Amino acid sequence: MMAAAVVRAEVRRQRREERKKMASARTTEDPPENHVVADVACGTGAVTRSSSSSLVVSSSSASGSDESSSASPLSFPVSSPSTAVRSPGSAGVSTSLCSVERMVELSAQSPAADFSVSEAWRFEEAVNMALVACEAVSPYDRFRLIETPDENFLLVTNVIPRESAEVPVLDSSSSGGDSGPEDKKKNVGNKTAGEKNGGGSRAKRRRRRRAPKNDAATPSFLRRHDVLERFAAAAEPLPSLCVHDYALRNADRVTYDGELIYGSYLLYRKAHVELSLSSNKVQHVEAVLRQVYTPGLLDHHNVCDVEALLWLLYCGPRSFCARDTCFGREKNGCPFPALLPKLFYEPVRDYMTYMNLAELYVFVWYRGYEFPAPTPQATTAGGGGGGGSGGGGGAGACAVETSASAGRVDDAGDEVHLPLKPVSLDRLREVLQAVRGRFSGREVPAWPASSRTCLLCALYSQNRLCLDLARDEARTVSYSPIVIQDCAAAVTDVTLSHILPGQSTVSLFPVYHVGKLLDALSLNDAGLITLNL
């Protein structure tokens, strides 16, 4: 027995010496290198690119001391399958970390020939795999690239949970009409105590209503005493917290021939009119860009370059009125900007709806459009104050003159060419490609956004339609008239009204004095329009 124990101890000692020799040889052959790591499960797993040019997915165990309890890593070869795969030292990573120190060291070497192309390709593959892993974990979130003081990059996403509408459950225990067994026991006890104390008659106690147990925590609409009202309250749908989809609907139904059906009025105010006709929307776009890049506001399928998207929407070549007889050509020598819905001229409340509708307008307006090649004259043009490119100090890439005469109308008169810098053309082309890739091959409501008409031309067409309806006695019309709320001085006495039979509703077609509105416009040097009414 003693001899067998001595032999086993000697065998274990020889094995330990062999492991030490193999470890020292491996350390001298392969120096340690930096890794590209991406967290895939909130600290429980990691995707790592080791020095052996492989991508290793490992899972951290609860007990790090026990080697048998740790999960075996799964290797994904990047370039050479024959390369040995080593698991990282520590698999617990709390953030999505992409280290670029190895790339900087290779590129900073003095001889250019020493920079291996295969090493750069392997690094790019590892970074792409890290991005794919992060997107697989959070497919509906957008990641923001932040550089750390250690020359690393973090992929940060929103960690705050999304709000979800909670539907209150209407049951017998929380309502005041029906009572459960516990309520019956309490009522019996109260009745006995009341009879003992001699309080009130039996008829009064029968007419007394029983209150719910948690009256303070119960919503007001659940404390209704009528049974029918409680059923009606349970059937009422709760308002949604945020609207992710946008759809325009005008007419709901037609009951009989001869009825005029109108959609909701398009209400604008004086501030909306001034901003819609101004070619300089820098302040408005800056306010949008100040909050739009906050993680969690947009989805991963939205356009990343929001600044270039808003440039195309507010002051791009296809963002002006397409009518040959636009009032802006006579007033300023350049057509007015096309009219957009009211939400584009107000502070943004729902960024998801705002961005989806903006991408839809850009997709419809620039369908089949390609930017011309840059000319030397356009290269040397400095541009003005950013004409809607916004962005503050770093928005010079999309700079353009903000005056109304900055655009140049071609001979055909169908579009406006603006002096663009060559740096901005690449960004605009990428945005158009991303928007077309999102909406191409899909059925989208293109008819609401297909019209490129300014506000004054839309009011002129509305006046003509109003008079045509009165003359021809149209049978059924689906139309949403424009109403300017605080410009009563521009409304004429000619107003078409229709009283629907059997109802007290009156549908009005307001007729505006377009000439008075045009005379009240004043343009300053910054491209801002003021309506003096």
UniProtKB/Swiss-Prot annotation:
Annotated region (Disordered), positions in chain: 1-92, 167-216
Extent of Basic residues compositional bias: 202-211
Low complexity composition bias: residue spans: 50-82
Subcellular location: Host nucleus
Transmembrane annotation, as ranges: none
One cellular component (GO) term of this entry: host cell nucleus
Keywords assigned: Early protein, Host nucleus
UniProt keyword Protease present: no
Biased composition (Basic and acidic residues): 9-33
Pfam families the UniProt entry points to: Herpes_UL95
Superkingdom: Viruses
Record family assignment: Belongs to the herpesviridae UL95 family.
Role of this protein: Participates in the expression of late viral mRNAs. Expressed before viral DNA replication, UL95 assembles at the viral pre-replication complexes (pre-RCs) containing the early viral protein UL44.
Protein name: Protein UL95
The species this protein was found in: Human cytomegalovirus (strain Merlin)
